[in-house]
């Protein structure tokens, strides 16, 4: 139980962590209001309907003062009485007209501006008090300001220059407000918009401004809002981030602060400039290992109280050259104040990075403080500040830390759409208890989003997208460009339950809720989660207001639980509701049964509109969105069971059941444990099978290894000795391993004469002469044996020829043998079976011949074949080591001759008798390279041919490289004196790699000709000739003396070469052949 509880805790922490670091997904709206429904909302265009001759509105700003809405545009200011509820069109009650003079327009045209720009666009409309309002306009690029009476909009007073109070161009942004009788404005102060300024004018005292052309203070700003709070005035804007100039041009959102009692600096420092100007970054980002920032501030609200905390809420977007993305972030004023009390940021050199300033380097009083308040309480005015403080604030206006959002994350994000959010308005007291916060956000596409905000970090629910409203009306508003669809501003009229959405050419009034759409469908009303709507006891869904009794309505804003409610099939909406048509269709994951909805296939109009405007909603229920369309009012009568003005939901019986969170977590845990168990069993079974397979493979490898001979005991049939032959040095000491083969079980003395070991008392060669040696035993690869079946007939003919022409057994020397009792060669030559053929010795012949010989040498029974095979392998390996010991010049011949009988028994050798009729089972390797001459007798035994110590030809490069010592005991290879053994014209041939070798090479120039038995032999004087094999040789292959090429194999003494029996040849030395 404790483990299960611990597991649940860990799972909860992991889920919380994932929710914190994962990028939020876009929510689908619970309700959608498209153009067909929103087109009924009243629109303000600045001119009466049908009068298209008047100019467009060119909306600039909108301000609500008490029960009047002021709309400023080009050359005019309109007033709208909010107490009058419009039906189809918003009619202004009053209008202020202020046009530019003719001279100003002509001057504007002379400056190169278009005539449409040379008008008076009202950019400033700020109340001075309850009676007067301060109005400024661009006045054809010559800004001017006036005072007007607020109630009558009559001109009062004289014109004032609008320089540094109003921009020159209507496309430039600006903000302004009165605080303590002084006008605080932020705009550009020149025609080219290069001098951005935050300016204070009017009232007592001198005018103050920011430092001109100082990028550390302001760099290409875009001012959005100004508010008064406490002893300060705050400006919200975006600008080019000066701290990231080295990394590129990036836009950051800023909040700047100045003291209302700032009087400027002394005559030495910051005279007529702000002494309290500070700015900090607004950080609106998605948390995680790598933050995703929304850096561009688009709009921000006034200070509102959210959960008792003074807060500003803004909408932020990504950079202009980035992917579209928007977020809504809230910042508390306390967090902003905290940042301004933090550390400063500085750049020591123009090329260095920006770093934080240590606290010990900050002068006293602290820069940014207001005189007579806080740390600067001892100073009456800012003029009295020390020069160190003024100099520091002049070069360090930027704070090091950024202002974090509430809960360190956005309230709402929108990233899966192609538009950005541009305007924001907040109702902080929504619902009958005024305890909900609803955010209205405008976008570039003319869509207004209605969001139920998550205002507490401990809230269990995230922000919910309640509605998506298409507020733009292309039929009544200008549609000249995509910019006309952009929402410029939003104004909330909570008293009259309305929201004014401003576009460049019109203003649309939309209600805050559409409770009448749900009609008498309780399930749709509750599922909407709209804090403005509730289900009344009268059986209708209507707007709930403050003061209604709790028992008089029902709503579920937190969860929208409708599991206990049935489907909607009841009555029709009130008669005051306009006609509707079907919009959309069932969601993508459900299908509407024919019994639930009756469709009319003969109505192409409804089909086209459904396809064009349908937006899928990924929910588990089937939903329809209904909206107004006067042209199809008769069509809705043909659809049975669909009430007008009702968002009708048809759900299956299974979807009404909800699963409790504990049950869901338990199921997930059980599934995880079961999956882990199954995975463990699968891994165990797989591992067991894999281990068994490896053991079987290992066992097969060992058995295959035991069936093979030593490295020098088989012939390579597929390549005819591709690699150079191993050669062994004569003076290698014999190991002590062979002492057990002797009768006396003692090692031979090192000075024992080995020559006497080779001859018995009858003068015959030793019986060991018939045994194969490592030098004369080729390597047989068994993998190529099956590929040589094509030569089986040759193998049979080869066996028959050997029966007809038996060979001499080496135990009795031939008549012309030069051997004597006192002399025996140090290497013993075996008869070569390949001399019996006139054709080339193929691989298959060798293989089958050896199989036949093996069957003759080992006539064992089937029952003991495996045991005898292993013993045979061990005997051959031991024999190889013994023969190495026999070749040792320091061996004792008497001890070896005395142990011949025991060696025969130990090595499991066959009697010598059968071998007199059958040749040795292993052919001579050197002799197999040649085809014997046709003139030689078949039965002639092979002879030992010794090479003299001093060769008759120059030493080869291989011999020079190996550095052999010249002594009488050294034996040279026959390849030192090449002899033609098979070529009819006596030419020395070099065997080169060839895929189709069938000819002879001509005699090379510069060759020395010798004669062996009357046949001219070409002796090549070059260092060496290569010997290669052929895979496709046909017919009789020429055999010739060979020369070895240098190789990378270890240095070993050369082995003797063997040739068929010939007549005696006397070279330059004393040896007899």
Curated annotation (Swiss-Prot):
Glycans are attached at residues 51, 283, 435, 461, 631. Disulfide bonds join 108-118, 136-145, 259-370, 284-329, 477-506, 515-533, 521-568, 525-541. It comes from Mus musculus (Mouse). Residues 745-825, 839-876, 919-986, 1021-1073 are annotated as: Disordered. The modification Phosphoserine is found at residues 723, 734, 744, 931, 957, 983. One of its GO terms (cellular component) is collagen-containing extracellular matrix. The chain crosses the membrane at residues 663-683. InterPro entries: Plexin_repeat, Semap_dom, Semap_dom_sf, Semaphorin, WD40/YVTN_repeat-like_dom_sf. It is a single-pass type I membrane protein. One of its GO terms (biological process) is negative regulation of smooth muscle cell migration. It is found in: Cell membrane. Residues 684-1073 are cytoplasmic. Residues 931-942, 1021-1037, 1059-1073 have a biased composition (Polar residues). Residues 27-512 form the Sema domain. GO terms for molecular function: receptor ligand activity; semaphorin receptor binding. The keyword Lipid biosynthesis does not apply. Belongs to the semaphorin family. Residues 514-569 form the PSI domain. The modification Phosphothreonine is found at residue 773. Expressed in brain and lung. This is Semaphorin-6D. Gene3D superfamilies: ligand-binding face of the semaphorins, domain 2, YVTN repeat-like/Quinoprotein amine dehydrogenase. Residues 790-806 have a biased composition (Basic and acidic residues).
